[in-house]
Regions:
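Conserved short alpha-helical segments that host acidic/polar catalytic motifs at enzyme active sites
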Residues: 1-250, 254, 266-300, 338, ...
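Glycine-rich oxoanion-binding loops at beta->alpha junctions
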Residues: 71-84, 279-292, 316-352, 499-515
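Glycine-rich, anion-gripping cofactor-binding loops and their flanking helix/strand elements
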Residues: 183-205, 334-368, 507-543, 573-587, ...
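Active-site phosphate/pyrophosphate-binding segments
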Residues: 264-268, 272-302, 392-521, 594-614
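Glycine-rich phosphate-binding loops that contact phosphosugars or nucleotide phosphates
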Residues: 293-438, 442-445, 525-566, 589
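Generic C-terminus detector
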Residues: 548, 561-563, 573-614
């Protein structure tokens, strides 16, 4: 959520800032704003409710000159979406401007203290409290901006990524972070600042990922300086980031989401590259090689995740338990961190997050560390916080995912969990050789079978028009298909705003069957596997109650075709790999229904791509 961009250098800052905000639109937001220091030392703050395009329209006749500036997209946490509550916020004197991602937990206490000292506030936000606090300290003690920020952060409780400019010190930007990401791009006599690498990569591939507790000082013509609140200088690694600008463009597709759905065959190929050797019939994960003892000695594995990543975790649980014979628990990270879990050094904790910045998952990792657990991270964003906080892990290597509703990250996570389960099972000797070889071979064929499945796009597009009337959907699956049903329901909810629920098919008769009537479409994942006959019975029960059945079936299934209203035939694969195939039609169905309803599929309302606050 919330996107931060900053620039200081020889260029005009405004175009850089606007383009950066556009690159961060995928994170979700309800308002946007910018603050610029012009060549005469004037500070100009412009902000508005709505999109970045609305901000550009608002600024069309404004003074947007200057080579120093910050900009922000806001997703409301304190105070309703409005131009007043939008960032940047400025101090009472109008000398300072700040942008902020995160939550200041003790803002109410700080605000009360400042009000008692005579300060007034324009907005309802926690962010304005912080900029007023910085200026109060600055004026009371006659300090420079850096020292004032350091003292202010001493008093702050919470998570934050902030950037400040001061028109009295116009040649610098101060940035700081705690439990919220910030990246600095180092150019030629210039610095770029952002929440992630996407706004920066067009200008430089040299980047510094700030660690928790860091305060960065960016001054034109000087080296990057990083200190802590006690003004102790910190070592800051500057790394070269391998990310191409073309990877974050739409590439001719109408939406990022559709582009990312169609990228999945290539993404899964990239995910498996160097990890699966079909000729040698072998799976190699460096993390398993390097940390074999810690992983194989685990008495239990806890997987923590949120949203779509949690659904991937459920599939990983079945893979690991089936083939490694290690008990696995899957928990929402938000619940795990607060329920006093019984964990110890005998446990391995797997943390899954596309962005690597999910606040609850990061907090769960911190808790696991306190209990001496061995921690394995599965992430997409290279250099993000979770990989830096874990003992080892695997990147999914699916490239930037811009659409808020996750698609290719889900299949990437499932692929890595499958590789992990196979590698561990092989090392433990808990999988039969013929089973291992057959799964490895079939896994190598998944990208081609994904391509086959994507050829159903036109069919699913036509199908979606039939069901735009629906107010509710039910998704059913069993075994490995149950998490796919959950994920399909989530996708529909996220982008079409249609209520949808995913259930194990066997649980239908324990409640959901009461909802089924002629207005209730039911999506059933009914491929040929050990529970095929039982799922067939579920379909017959739905039809007996006049429900509309959309069935995902194995190719050539005539039996279900006779009774289902709509049938989508899928390429055959092994049961444990079916989620990688079956999820694609559900992604397409959600996408096309949302498009038919005129929804913004890339930026659905109230959602954020990277949830960096609780």
């Amino acid at each position: 959520m919330c996107g931060i961009v900053g620039y200081i250098g020889d260029k005009e800052a405004y175009p850089v800032l606007i383009k950066g905000l556009e690159r961060l639109e995928y994170r979700g937001y309800d308002s946007a704003g910018t603050a610029l220091i012009d060549d005469n030392g004037g500070l100009h703050v412009y902000k508005t409710k709505g999109k970045v395009a609305d901000l550009q329209h608002y600024c069309a006749d404004k003074d947007v000159t200057g080579c120093v500036g910050i900009a922000h997209t806001r997703w409301a946490t304190h105070g309703e979406p409005s131009s007043v509550n939008a960032h940047p916020h400025y101090s009472e004197s109008g000398n300072l401007a700040i942008i902020h991602n995160g939550i200041i937990e003790n803002y109410a206490d700080l605000k009360k203290k400042l009000q008692e000292k005579g300060l007034t506030f324009r907005s309802d936000t926690d962010t304005e409290v912080l900029v007023q606090l910085v200026e109060y300290i600055q004026q009371k003690k006659h300090l420079d901006l850096l020292t004032s920020v350091q003292l202010a952060l001493h008093e702050v409780i919470g998570a934050y990524a902030i950037a400040l400019i001061d028109k009295r010190e116009p040649h610098q930007i101060i940035a700081a972070c705690r439990q919220s990401p910030l990246v600095i791009g180092v150019g030629n006599n210039e610095f770029f600042l952002a929440s992630d690498a996407s706004p920066i990569i067009e200008y430089t591939d040299k980047m510094a990922y700030l660690e928790d507790g860091s305060i960065a000082v960016m001054k034109q013509g000087e080296e990057l300086k990083v200190v802590d609140v006690l003004n102790r200088e910190l070592f800051q690694k500057i790394q070269t980031v391998d990310l191409e600008l073309g990877q974050i463009e739409k590439g001719g597709y109408p939406h990022f989401m559709l582009k990312e759905i169609f990228e999945q065959p290539e993404c899964i190929t990239n995910c498996m590259r160097g990890r699966i050797n079909v000729e040698a019939t072998n799976v190699t994960l460096s993390a398993v090689i390097d940390y074999k003892r810690q992983l194989l000695s685990a008495k239990r594995i806890n997987i923590v995740a949120c949203g779509t990543s949690w659904h991937a975790a459920l599939i990983g649980k079945q893979m690991i338990e089936s083939y490694c014979r290690i008990p696995v628990e899957v928990e929402y990270a938000s619940e795990f961190r607060y329920r006093r879990p019984v964990i110890s050094s005998d446990d391995v904790v797997i943390a899954i997050s596309q962005s690597g910045e999910t606040a609850d998952t990061l907090a769960a990792v911190k808790l696991a560390k306190q209990h001496n657990c061995f921690i394995y991270g599965i992430c997409n964003a290279i250099g993000s916080s979770i990989p830096r906080a874990t003992d080892t892990g695997s990147y999914i290597h699916v490239g930037p995912e811009i659409g808020v509703a996750s698609t290719k990250a889900f299949t990437g996570q499932v692929t890595v969990l499958t590789l992990l389960a196979l590698a561990l099972a092989k090392e433990k000797g808990t999988i039969k050789e013929e089973t291992y070889l057959s799964i490895v071979k079939e896994l190598s064929l998944i990208p081609e079978k994904m391509k086959e499945t994507l050829q159903l796009n036109d069919r699913i597009c036509a199908l979606s028009r039939i069901f735009t009337y629906a107010k509710n959907f039910l998704y059913l699956g069993r075994g490995f298909s149950y998490p796919v049903a959950l994920e399909g329901a989530l996708k529909l909810k996220e982008i079409s705003y249609i209520h949808a629920e995913g259930y194990p098919a066997a649980e239908m008769k324990h409640g959901p069957i009461a909802l089924i009537d002629s207005d209730m479409p039911v999506v059933v994942i009914a491929t040929r596997n050990a529970m095929y006959e039982k799922v067939l019975n579920n379909i017959q029960e739905i039809k007996a109650r006049k429900g509309k059945v959309i069935a995902l079936v194995s190719r050539g299934d005539d039996e279900i075709s006779k009774i289902a209203d709509e049938v989508i035939e899928l390429p055959d694969t092994q049961e444990c790999l079916e989620p990688l195939i079956a999820t694609i039609p559900l992604q397409l169905l959600a996408y096309h229904i949302a498009v038919c309803k005129g929804k913004n599929v890339d930026q659905p309302r109230n959602l954020a791509k990277s949830v960096t606050v609780e």
